[in-house]
Every structure is written in structure tokens, then in C-alpha cells.
């Protein structure tokens, strides 16, 4: 019976990441259709991402304290109710202001749900198995990011209005709701008491938080500007450029599945050093490659070897305390989300003043910094073990 409950809780975590992945991808995919619906330009619609990301960031930050006041089960039930309200609000939105408010609410729901999903996994599993399960959980983010564009394209091709895509998105949260009602959450009462342990921040937690921010910033800065770089600098046509980006994310998802098995047999800190080092070298090779074939195989390798880095950062942070801490997990997610928000704020001026080539080098430098941080974290842990 306990095993069945654990399976239900694990699937809640899987679906929580699937919900966030789908939400982010579909909002970008139907940007043009939303702009036409509200008679705005695509550039004017770009603030939607700000509302969505702001909602995710704020909710992750607030959930560090909210989890002490409201049980996980109640939060997920309220999340389902708010998701229904937001989706109905989107369907019946008559102005861009109402749409922005509702997308912000979905961002709040998404951030809280994703942080809960991560916390559940860290409570249910320990050691290398925790890292393995977190990788599987993270793969659902990429999986829904691949499935929902197909659903979106199918609906739009049949002239079905764009807002029905959000209705399909609601199905994921409905599944979370069903599993929540039928599950017992022992972690919600006992484990959240360990949140005070974050007050005793050690240097590794700080370094892991910085690593999360720099890694996400480096990754998104790289992959966001690769299409423009390959078309303008390398002179590759847009179709082949699209294949490069697709190959990266496909390899990223496959990598998460593979490393969820491989990670059980290796030391997490050594794996962290190996993956950040390999990814830094591969990104360097990509930047200095000129042929399409070299770019293709390099970006596939980069997607594969970088896939487990963020999850390993979360896992290592969760192992810094004797028992899982929701505040600690949310701290890493919070820094990762800041990296997402800073992507275009930092890279757009670099592109404007120094060009695309310099922007990719900037991304590579961030990866190298994370590699050095991983070495410092390993060294600190060895000292801690000897004490």
C-alpha cells in the first residue's frame, strides 16, 4: 500500500514538470496567434513571457514559507482551482490586460507545483536514487515541450482557436488533482519541519545556488542565439538551423533518461565535474566549428552531456542537509529561474554591441565558471568528510 502511494506521489512530481514545460512552450508557440487575436504586434506581445516568468519566480520564492503554513495536498488542490479560473479567464479574455493577469496566475500555479514536485522527490528518495528520480522528473519537462507543440500545430492547422490549447494544458493539472486526492502526503507534515536547516547556509549551498544561476543563464543564452548565429555567421539555412536546435533538445531529453540510470553507479560530485567540464569543451568546439556536420554532432553531444547538470545541482544541494529542506530546494529553483529571467536582459545588449559570436563565448565562459565551481564544491566536500 505504501509502495502504491509512493508511485502516486512520484507521478504527481512527473506531471508537475510536464505542466510547467507545456505552459512555457505553448505560450511561445502561439505568440503570433495571440497577437493577431488582440490586434497587437508580436513585439508588443513579448511581455507575456515577463508575466509568466515573474509568476513562476515569485511563487517559488513564496512557497519556501507557504509550505510551512499550508499542507502540500491543500496547495495542489488550490492550484487546480486556480488553474481552472486562469484557463477560463484566458478563454474569455477580452483584453490583453486580462490575458496577462491570467497567464501570471498560471505562472504562480506552475512555480508552486514544480517546487512541490521537486520537494516530493527529494523526500521520497535519497542518495544516487534521488538524483536518478529527479532526472526522470526533469525529462517530463522536455517531453511535454515536445508533445504540446505537435498538439498546438494540429489544433491551429484545423483553424481551432489558440485558447483551446490551454484547455488541453488543464488536463495535466486535472491528473495531478486526481492523484492528489487519492494520495497520502506524509512528507507535508514531517519533512517541512526541517526547513530551519537552511539558516545554517554552508559555502557549498551558496556555490550550488550560483552554479544553478550561471548554468541556466549560460544554457539559455547559448541555445537562444544559436539560430541567429548559424544563419547569419555560418550562413546555414533556417531549416537546418531548426534541426540543430531540435537535435539539442532531443539529445537533452535522451541524456536525462540515460543519466537517470548511469548516475546510480557514480559519485555525484565527480559526475558534476565531468559533465560541466565536457559541456564546456563541447560548447567551445561548437563555437569554433564551421561545417554543418560538425555543428550537428557537437550540439547533439552538448545536449546529451549537459542534460544532467541542473538536476545534479539540485540533488547535491538537497544532500547538504541531514533531511530534505523545502526552503533549500526552492532556493536552487529560485536562482535557476533568475538565470532564465536574466537571459535576454544580459545577452541582448551584448548582441547589439559586440555581436552573436561574443554572446556565445559569454555562454561558454559561464559554463567554464560552473566547472571551476564544481571543483571547489568537490574540494570543500572532501574537507568536510575528513573533519
Swiss-Prot record:
Transmembrane segments: 11-31, 47-67, 76-96, 101-121, 134-154, 160-180, 205-225, 243-263, 271-291, 299-319, 331-351, 358-378
Organism: Buchnera aphidicola subsp. Schizaphis graminum (strain Sg)
A GO CC term attached to the entry: plasma membrane
PROSITE patterns assigned: MFS
Bilayer topology annotation: Multi-pass membrane protein
Annotated protein name in UniProt: Protein TsgA homolog
Pfam families tied to this protein: MFS_1
Family according to the record: Belongs to the major facilitator superfamily. TsgA family.
Keyword Membrane: yes
Lineage: Bacteria, Pseudomonadati, Pseudomonadota, Gammaproteobacteria, Enterobacterales
Entry keyword set: Cell membrane, Membrane, Transmembrane, Transmembrane helix
Domain of life of the organism encoding this protein: Bacteria
Compartment annotation: Cell membrane
Protein biosynthesis in keyword set: no
Alphabetized InterPro entries for the sequence: MFS, MFS_dom, MFS_trans_sf, MFS_TsgA, MFS_TsgA-like
One annotated GO molecular function: transmembrane transporter activity
